[in-house]
Amino acid sequence: MGAPLSTTRRGMGQNLSVPNPLGFFPDHQLDPLFRANSSSPDWDFNTNKDSWPMANKVGVGGYGPGFTPPHGGLLGWSPQAQGVLTTLPADPPPASTNRRSGRKPTPVSPPLRDTHPQAMQWNSTQFHQALLDPRVRALYFPAGGSSSGTQNPAPTIASLTSSIFSKTGGPAMNMDNITSGLLGPLLVLQAVCFLLTKILTIPQSLDSWWTSLNFLGGLPGCPGQNSQSPTSNHLPTSCPPTCPGYRWMCLRRFIIFLFILLLCLIFLLVLLDYQGMLPVCPLLPGSTTTSTGPCKTCTTLAQGTSMFPSCCCSKPSDGNCTCIPIPSSWALGKYLWEWASARFSWLSLLVQFVQWCVGLSPTVWLLVIWMIWYWGPNLCSILSPFIPLLPIFCYLWVSI
Protein backbone atom coordinates (compact mmCIF):
# COMPACT_ATOMS: atom_id res chain seq x y z
CA MET A 1 0.00 0.00 0.00
CA GLY A 2 1.22 3.30 -0.82
CA ALA A 3 1.65 6.04 1.63
CA PRO A 4 -1.50 8.01 2.31
CA LEU A 5 -1.84 11.05 0.25
CA SER A 6 -1.46 14.21 2.32
CA THR A 7 -3.26 17.17 0.85
CA THR A 8 -1.91 20.48 1.94
CA ARG A 9 -4.41 23.29 2.17
CA ARG A 10 -3.43 25.89 -0.36
CA GLY A 11 -3.41 29.41 0.91
CA MET A 12 -5.08 32.26 -0.89
CA GLY A 13 -1.75 33.72 -1.86
CA GLN A 14 -0.62 30.56 -3.64
CA ASN A 15 -2.97 31.15 -6.54
CA LEU A 16 -0.54 32.82 -8.91
CA SER A 17 -2.82 32.78 -11.93
CA VAL A 18 -3.50 36.48 -11.53
CA PRO A 19 -0.41 38.71 -11.68
CA ASN A 20 0.48 40.02 -8.26
CA PRO A 21 4.23 40.63 -8.23
CA LEU A 22 4.46 42.55 -4.96
CA GLY A 23 1.90 40.61 -2.96
CA PHE A 24 0.02 43.79 -2.15
CA PHE A 25 -3.62 42.93 -2.75
CA PRO A 26 -5.68 41.04 -0.14
CA ASP A 27 -6.34 37.99 -2.37
CA HIS A 28 -2.60 37.19 -2.61
CA GLN A 29 -1.15 38.09 0.75
CA LEU A 30 0.43 34.69 1.20
CA ASP A 31 2.92 35.21 -1.62
CA PRO A 32 6.57 34.75 -0.72
CA LEU A 33 7.07 38.47 -1.05
CA PHE A 34 4.44 38.93 1.66
CA ARG A 35 6.48 36.85 4.16
CA ALA A 36 4.52 33.65 3.62
CA ASN A 37 6.29 30.32 4.22
CA SER A 38 5.51 26.66 4.08
CA SER A 39 5.18 26.40 7.84
CA SER A 40 2.18 28.72 7.98
CA PRO A 41 0.38 28.45 4.65
CA ASP A 42 -3.07 28.66 6.13
CA TRP A 43 -4.96 31.96 5.95
CA ASP A 44 -6.49 31.74 9.39
CA PHE A 45 -3.18 31.13 11.15
CA ASN A 46 -0.95 33.47 9.21
CA THR A 47 -0.02 36.55 11.30
CA ASN A 48 0.98 38.56 8.25
CA LYS A 49 -2.43 38.66 6.67
CA ASP A 50 -4.30 41.84 5.95
CA SER A 51 -6.18 43.27 8.91
CA TRP A 52 -8.70 44.94 6.60
CA PRO A 53 -10.56 42.17 4.77
CA MET A 54 -13.18 44.65 3.59
CA ALA A 55 -10.61 46.09 1.20
CA ASN A 56 -11.21 43.05 -1.00
CA LYS A 57 -14.60 44.45 -1.90
CA VAL A 58 -13.63 47.22 -4.24
CA GLY A 59 -16.29 49.80 -4.88
CA VAL A 60 -17.93 49.99 -8.28
CA GLY A 61 -15.85 52.07 -10.60
CA GLY A 62 -12.93 52.19 -8.18
CA TYR A 63 -10.49 52.28 -11.07
CA GLY A 64 -12.44 54.77 -13.13
CA PRO A 65 -15.84 54.68 -14.83
CA GLY A 66 -16.11 51.67 -17.10
CA PHE A 67 -12.43 50.67 -16.78
CA THR A 68 -12.18 46.92 -17.36
CA PRO A 69 -8.85 45.38 -18.46
CA PRO A 70 -9.19 42.86 -21.31
CA HIS A 71 -7.80 39.98 -19.22
CA GLY A 72 -9.55 40.83 -15.98
CA GLY A 73 -8.99 43.35 -13.23
CA LEU A 74 -5.97 43.51 -10.99
CA LEU A 75 -8.04 41.95 -8.24
CA GLY A 76 -9.38 39.09 -10.34
CA TRP A 77 -12.48 38.47 -12.35
CA SER A 78 -14.99 39.60 -9.72
CA PRO A 79 -17.81 41.89 -10.95
CA GLN A 80 -16.71 44.62 -8.57
CA ALA A 81 -13.15 44.59 -9.89
CA GLN A 82 -14.37 44.77 -13.49
CA GLY A 83 -16.56 47.80 -12.83
CA VAL A 84 -19.88 46.02 -13.32
CA LEU A 85 -22.71 47.87 -11.63
CA THR A 86 -23.68 45.34 -9.00
CA THR A 87 -24.92 46.07 -5.53
CA LEU A 88 -23.29 44.31 -2.61
CA PRO A 89 -25.08 44.02 0.71
CA ALA A 90 -23.35 46.04 3.37
CA ASP A 91 -21.94 43.89 6.15
CA PRO A 92 -22.48 45.03 9.71
CA PRO A 93 -19.47 46.60 11.39
CA PRO A 94 -17.24 44.29 13.39
CA ALA A 95 -18.31 44.03 16.98
CA SER A 96 -15.01 42.80 18.33
CA THR A 97 -14.57 45.88 20.49
CA ASN A 98 -18.06 45.54 21.90
CA ARG A 99 -17.57 41.84 22.64
CA ARG A 100 -14.32 42.49 24.45
CA SER A 101 -15.74 45.26 26.61
CA GLY A 102 -19.02 43.53 27.21
CA ARG A 103 -21.11 46.31 25.67
CA LYS A 104 -23.90 45.79 23.26
CA PRO A 105 -24.03 47.79 20.03
CA THR A 106 -25.71 51.15 20.39
CA PRO A 107 -29.21 50.95 18.93
CA VAL A 108 -30.23 53.32 16.17
CA SER A 109 -31.98 56.38 17.56
CA PRO A 110 -35.60 56.71 16.46
CA PRO A 111 -36.48 59.75 14.37
CA LEU A 112 -37.36 62.98 16.12
CA ARG A 113 -40.87 63.06 14.70
CA ASP A 114 -41.64 59.80 16.57
CA THR A 115 -40.05 60.70 19.91
CA HIS A 116 -40.88 64.43 20.05
CA PRO A 117 -43.72 65.25 17.67
CA GLN A 118 -44.22 68.60 19.35
CA ALA A 119 -40.77 69.71 18.16
CA MET A 120 -41.78 69.29 14.53
CA GLN A 121 -44.29 72.11 14.76
CA TRP A 122 -42.43 75.04 13.15
CA ASN A 123 -44.89 77.63 14.36
CA SER A 124 -42.87 80.12 16.41
CA THR A 125 -45.26 80.10 19.38
CA GLN A 126 -45.58 76.34 19.54
CA PHE A 127 -41.87 75.90 18.96
CA HIS A 128 -40.93 78.11 21.92
CA GLN A 129 -43.48 76.30 24.06
CA ALA A 130 -41.91 73.00 23.04
CA LEU A 131 -38.51 74.30 24.11
CA LEU A 132 -39.77 74.36 27.69
CA ASP A 133 -39.47 70.58 27.66
CA PRO A 134 -35.94 69.71 28.90
CA ARG A 135 -35.74 66.81 26.46
CA VAL A 136 -36.48 69.05 23.48
CA ARG A 137 -34.17 71.80 24.72
CA ALA A 138 -31.34 69.30 25.03
CA LEU A 139 -31.68 68.52 21.33
CA TYR A 140 -31.19 72.14 20.27
CA PHE A 141 -28.87 73.61 22.90
CA PRO A 142 -25.56 72.22 24.12
CA ALA A 143 -24.85 71.21 27.66
CA GLY A 144 -24.73 74.15 30.01
CA GLY A 145 -27.38 76.15 28.18
CA SER A 146 -29.45 78.57 30.18
CA SER A 147 -32.81 77.44 31.49
CA SER A 148 -34.54 80.48 30.03
CA GLY A 149 -34.30 79.08 26.53
CA THR A 150 -31.51 81.33 25.35
CA GLN A 151 -28.52 79.76 23.76
CA ASN A 152 -25.04 80.40 25.08
CA PRO A 153 -22.83 81.69 22.32
CA ALA A 154 -20.62 78.95 21.00
CA PRO A 155 -17.05 79.76 20.01
CA THR A 156 -16.79 80.65 16.39
CA ILE A 157 -14.60 78.18 14.51
CA ALA A 158 -13.89 79.25 10.96
CA SER A 159 -11.22 78.42 8.48
CA LEU A 160 -8.69 80.95 7.33
CA THR A 161 -10.48 81.46 4.03
CA SER A 162 -13.96 81.84 5.53
CA SER A 163 -12.77 84.13 8.32
CA ILE A 164 -11.66 86.66 5.75
CA PHE A 165 -15.18 87.16 4.46
CA SER A 166 -17.52 86.21 7.29
CA LYS A 167 -17.64 84.40 10.59
CA THR A 168 -19.19 80.98 10.99
CA GLY A 169 -22.74 81.36 12.15
CA GLY A 170 -22.84 85.06 11.35
CA PRO A 171 -25.44 86.71 9.15
CA ALA A 172 -25.21 86.22 5.44
CA MET A 173 -23.30 88.88 3.57
CA ASN A 174 -25.37 91.46 1.76
CA MET A 175 -24.55 91.07 -1.91
CA ASP A 176 -25.90 94.55 -2.64
CA ASN A 177 -23.19 96.12 -0.50
CA ILE A 178 -20.52 93.99 -2.17
CA THR A 179 -21.79 94.91 -5.62
CA SER A 180 -21.96 98.61 -4.82
CA GLY A 181 -18.52 98.48 -3.24
CA LEU A 182 -17.05 96.99 -6.40
CA LEU A 183 -19.12 99.03 -8.82
CA GLY A 184 -17.97 102.38 -7.44
CA PRO A 185 -14.22 101.90 -8.06
CA LEU A 186 -14.93 100.41 -11.48
CA LEU A 187 -16.97 103.44 -12.50
CA VAL A 188 -14.27 105.78 -11.20
CA LEU A 189 -11.61 103.85 -13.11
CA GLN A 190 -13.69 103.96 -16.27
CA ALA A 191 -14.25 107.72 -15.90
CA VAL A 192 -10.53 108.31 -15.29
CA CYS A 193 -9.56 106.28 -18.37
CA PHE A 194 -12.14 108.13 -20.47
CA LEU A 195 -10.96 111.55 -19.30
CA LEU A 196 -7.33 110.57 -19.78
CA THR A 197 -8.07 109.48 -23.33
CA LYS A 198 -9.86 112.74 -24.03
CA ILE A 199 -7.15 114.83 -22.41
CA LEU A 200 -4.51 113.19 -24.58
CA THR A 201 -6.49 114.31 -27.63
CA ILE A 202 -6.46 117.97 -26.50
CA PRO A 203 -3.03 118.77 -28.02
CA GLN A 204 -4.01 117.23 -31.35
CA SER A 205 -7.33 119.10 -31.41
CA LEU A 206 -5.70 122.40 -30.51
CA ASP A 207 -2.97 121.75 -33.07
CA SER A 208 -5.63 121.26 -35.75
CA TRP A 209 -7.39 124.45 -34.63
CA TRP A 210 -4.11 126.39 -34.61
CA THR A 211 -3.18 125.14 -38.07
CA SER A 212 -6.64 125.87 -39.46
CA LEU A 213 -6.19 129.56 -38.61
CA ASN A 214 -3.56 129.76 -41.35
CA PHE A 215 -5.67 127.91 -43.94
CA LEU A 216 -9.20 129.27 -44.08
CA GLY A 217 -10.18 126.94 -46.90
CA GLY A 218 -9.35 123.82 -44.91
CA LEU A 219 -6.24 121.87 -44.03
CA PRO A 220 -4.20 121.10 -47.18
CA GLY A 221 -1.46 118.53 -47.50
CA CYS A 222 1.69 118.99 -45.49
CA PRO A 223 3.91 121.56 -47.27
CA GLY A 224 7.04 120.07 -45.73
CA GLN A 225 7.32 117.26 -48.26
CA ASN A 226 10.16 117.34 -50.76
CA SER A 227 12.01 114.99 -53.03
CA GLN A 228 14.79 114.34 -50.53
CA SER A 229 12.46 112.81 -47.95
CA PRO A 230 9.44 111.47 -49.83
CA THR A 231 6.49 110.67 -47.59
CA SER A 232 2.87 109.82 -48.22
CA ASN A 233 0.25 112.53 -48.29
CA HIS A 234 -0.73 113.56 -44.77
CA LEU A 235 -2.04 116.52 -42.83
CA PRO A 236 0.24 119.06 -41.15
CA THR A 237 -1.03 117.87 -37.76
CA SER A 238 0.15 114.26 -38.24
CA CYS A 239 3.62 114.51 -39.70
CA PRO A 240 5.84 111.42 -39.43
CA PRO A 241 9.37 111.82 -38.05
CA THR A 242 10.83 111.73 -41.58
CA CYS A 243 8.85 114.80 -42.63
CA PRO A 244 10.51 118.24 -42.32
CA GLY A 245 7.27 119.57 -40.78
CA TYR A 246 7.60 117.15 -37.86
CA ARG A 247 9.71 119.59 -35.80
CA TRP A 248 7.14 122.36 -36.24
CA MET A 249 4.36 120.05 -35.15
CA CYS A 250 6.32 119.13 -32.00
CA LEU A 251 6.96 122.82 -31.29
CA ARG A 252 3.27 123.66 -31.60
CA ARG A 253 2.25 120.82 -29.29
CA PHE A 254 4.91 121.78 -26.73
CA ILE A 255 3.49 125.31 -26.62
CA ILE A 256 0.00 123.84 -26.26
CA PHE A 257 1.15 121.69 -23.33
CA LEU A 258 2.61 124.76 -21.63
CA PHE A 259 -0.66 126.59 -22.20
CA ILE A 260 -2.66 123.73 -20.63
CA LEU A 261 -0.28 123.64 -17.66
CA LEU A 262 -0.65 127.39 -17.19
CA LEU A 263 -4.43 127.02 -17.33
CA CYS A 264 -4.35 124.34 -14.61
CA LEU A 265 -2.09 126.47 -12.40
CA ILE A 266 -4.41 129.47 -12.77
CA PHE A 267 -7.37 127.32 -11.79
CA LEU A 268 -5.51 126.01 -8.74
CA LEU A 269 -4.53 129.54 -7.74
CA VAL A 270 -8.13 130.72 -8.02
CA LEU A 271 -9.33 127.76 -5.98
CA LEU A 272 -6.82 128.38 -3.19
CA ASP A 273 -7.69 132.07 -3.17
CA TYR A 274 -11.38 131.25 -2.90
CA GLN A 275 -10.72 128.96 0.07
CA GLY A 276 -8.73 131.68 1.84
CA MET A 277 -5.43 129.79 1.74
CA LEU A 278 -3.47 132.72 0.27
CA PRO A 279 -2.99 135.26 3.09
CA VAL A 280 -2.26 138.36 1.03
CA CYS A 281 -2.56 141.70 2.74
CA PRO A 282 -4.65 144.28 0.92
CA LEU A 283 -3.27 147.68 0.07
CA LEU A 284 -3.59 150.18 2.85
CA PRO A 285 -5.54 153.35 2.06
CA GLY A 286 -3.27 156.01 0.60
CA SER A 287 -0.34 153.64 0.21
CA THR A 288 1.07 151.41 -2.50
CA THR A 289 3.02 149.07 -0.21
CA THR A 290 2.19 146.94 2.78
CA SER A 291 4.18 145.60 5.70
CA THR A 292 3.25 142.25 7.16
CA GLY A 293 4.10 141.30 10.71
CA PRO A 294 2.73 140.54 14.17
CA CYS A 295 1.20 143.73 15.53
CA LYS A 296 1.79 143.98 19.24
CA THR A 297 0.19 147.40 19.71
CA CYS A 298 -2.45 148.55 17.25
CA THR A 299 -4.56 151.64 17.16
CA THR A 300 -7.30 149.54 15.52
CA LEU A 301 -7.65 145.85 16.29
CA ALA A 302 -7.92 143.42 13.40
CA GLN A 303 -11.37 141.95 12.96
CA GLY A 304 -11.78 138.78 10.93
CA THR A 305 -10.94 135.12 10.77
CA SER A 306 -7.43 135.48 9.42
CA MET A 307 -4.99 132.77 10.46
CA PHE A 308 -1.58 133.76 9.05
CA PRO A 309 -0.43 136.34 9.68
CA SER A 310 -2.62 137.75 12.41
CA CYS A 311 -3.03 141.10 10.71
CA CYS A 312 -1.59 143.42 8.09
CA CYS A 313 0.27 146.40 9.48
CA SER A 314 1.45 149.66 8.09
CA LYS A 315 4.94 150.83 8.91
CA PRO A 316 4.83 152.29 12.39
CA SER A 317 5.56 155.99 12.60
CA ASP A 318 4.85 156.85 16.21
CA GLY A 319 5.38 153.42 17.74
CA ASN A 320 1.88 152.17 16.88
CA CYS A 321 0.61 150.55 13.70
CA THR A 322 -2.73 150.16 12.00
CA CYS A 323 -3.90 146.55 11.74
CA ILE A 324 -6.10 145.52 8.84
CA PRO A 325 -7.61 142.02 8.78
CA ILE A 326 -6.84 139.69 5.91
CA PRO A 327 -9.95 138.82 3.88
CA SER A 328 -11.14 135.29 4.48
CA SER A 329 -11.74 134.82 0.75
CA TRP A 330 -10.43 136.30 -2.49
CA ALA A 331 -7.53 138.02 -0.70
CA LEU A 332 -5.23 137.70 -3.71
CA GLY A 333 -7.95 138.81 -6.13
CA LYS A 334 -8.73 141.91 -4.11
CA TYR A 335 -5.05 142.73 -3.82
CA LEU A 336 -4.50 142.39 -7.58
CA TRP A 337 -7.58 144.50 -8.31
CA GLU A 338 -6.50 147.26 -5.94
CA TRP A 339 -2.96 147.16 -7.31
CA ALA A 340 -4.18 147.38 -10.93
CA SER A 341 -6.70 150.12 -10.11
CA ALA A 342 -3.98 152.21 -8.46
CA ARG A 343 -1.86 152.11 -11.63
CA PHE A 344 -4.59 152.10 -14.28
CA SER A 345 -7.33 154.53 -13.34
CA TRP A 346 -9.56 153.54 -16.25
CA LEU A 347 -10.16 150.12 -14.65
CA SER A 348 -12.37 151.83 -12.08
CA LEU A 349 -14.83 152.51 -14.90
CA LEU A 350 -15.39 148.78 -15.24
CA VAL A 351 -17.00 148.73 -11.83
CA GLN A 352 -19.55 151.26 -12.98
CA PHE A 353 -20.08 149.30 -16.18
CA VAL A 354 -20.76 146.11 -14.24
CA GLN A 355 -23.19 147.92 -11.98
CA TRP A 356 -24.89 149.34 -15.06
CA CYS A 357 -25.19 145.86 -16.62
CA VAL A 358 -26.81 144.54 -13.46
CA GLY A 359 -29.52 147.19 -13.72
CA LEU A 360 -30.36 146.43 -17.37
CA SER A 361 -33.84 145.40 -18.40
CA PRO A 362 -34.68 141.76 -19.24
CA THR A 363 -34.96 142.73 -22.93
CA VAL A 364 -31.25 143.50 -23.07
CA TRP A 365 -30.43 140.21 -21.40
CA LEU A 366 -32.58 138.33 -23.93
CA LEU A 367 -30.67 140.09 -26.70
CA VAL A 368 -27.38 139.01 -25.15
CA ILE A 369 -28.65 135.44 -24.85
CA TRP A 370 -29.69 135.46 -28.51
CA MET A 371 -26.25 136.69 -29.55
CA ILE A 372 -24.60 133.97 -27.50
CA TRP A 373 -26.89 131.39 -29.11
CA TYR A 374 -26.04 132.72 -32.58
CA TRP A 375 -22.29 132.76 -32.01
CA GLY A 376 -22.34 129.77 -29.71
CA PRO A 377 -21.52 127.02 -32.25
CA ASN A 378 -18.32 128.78 -33.24
CA LEU A 379 -17.38 129.23 -29.60
CA CYS A 380 -18.16 125.59 -28.87
CA SER A 381 -15.91 124.44 -31.70
CA ILE A 382 -13.10 126.50 -30.17
CA LEU A 383 -13.74 125.48 -26.55
CA SER A 384 -14.65 121.83 -27.21
CA PRO A 385 -11.08 120.54 -26.66
CA PHE A 386 -11.20 121.89 -23.10
CA ILE A 387 -14.46 120.15 -22.19
CA PRO A 388 -12.70 117.07 -20.66
CA LEU A 389 -10.98 119.39 -18.19
CA LEU A 390 -14.28 120.73 -16.84
CA PRO A 391 -15.19 117.61 -14.76
CA ILE A 392 -11.73 117.62 -13.18
CA PHE A 393 -11.99 121.31 -12.31
CA CYS A 394 -15.48 120.86 -10.88
CA TYR A 395 -14.35 117.91 -8.74
CA LEU A 396 -11.39 119.85 -7.36
CA TRP A 397 -13.58 122.89 -6.69
CA VAL A 398 -16.06 120.82 -4.67
CA SER A 399 -13.52 118.63 -2.84
CA ILE A 400 -11.07 121.37 -1.85
From Swiss-Prot:
Region feature Pre-S2, mapped onto this chain = 120-174
Which family, according to UniProt?
Belongs to the orthohepadnavirus major surface antigen family.
Keyword check for rRNA-binding: no
- Virion surface compartment segments: 2-181, 275-348, 399-400
Q: Does the keyword Transit peptide apply?
A: no
The record lists the membrane-crossing segments as 182-202, 254-274, 349-369, 376-398
Q: What is the lineage of its organism?
A: Viruses, Riboviria, Pararnavirae, Artverviricota, Revtraviricetes
Chain intervals for the UniProt region annotation (Pre-S): 2-174
Annotated region Pre-S1: the residues are 2-119
Q: What GO CC annotations are associated with the protein? A: membrane; viral envelope; virion membrane
Post-translational modification as stated in the protein's UniProt record: Isoform M is N-terminally acetylated by host at a ratio of 90%, and N-glycosylated by host at the pre-S2 region. Myristoylated.
Intravirion topological segments: 2-253, 203-253, 370-375
Q: Where is the lipid attached (N-myristoyl glycine)?
A: G2
What is the first-listed, main subcellular location in coarse terms? virion
Q: Where is this region: Disordered?
A: 84-117
Protein name as annotated: Large envelope protein
Annotated InterPro entries: HBV_HBSAG (IPR000349)
Q: Where does the record say this protein resides? A: Virion membrane
Provide the glycosylation site positions.
Answer: N320
**Species name:** Hepatitis B virus genotype F2 (isolate Brazil/w4B)
A Pfam family (short name) is vMSA
Q: Which GO terms are recorded in the biological process aspect for this UniProt protein? A: caveolin-mediated endocytosis of virus by host cell; fusion of virus membrane with host endosome membrane; virion attachment to host cell
Q: What does this protein do?
A: The large envelope protein exists in two topological conformations, one which is termed 'external' or Le-HBsAg and the other 'internal' or Li-HBsAg. In its external conformation the protein attaches the virus to cell receptors and thereby initiating infection. This interaction determines the species specificity and liver tropism. This attachment induces virion internalization predominantly through caveolin-mediated endocytosis. The large envelope protein also assures fusion between virion membrane and endosomal membrane.
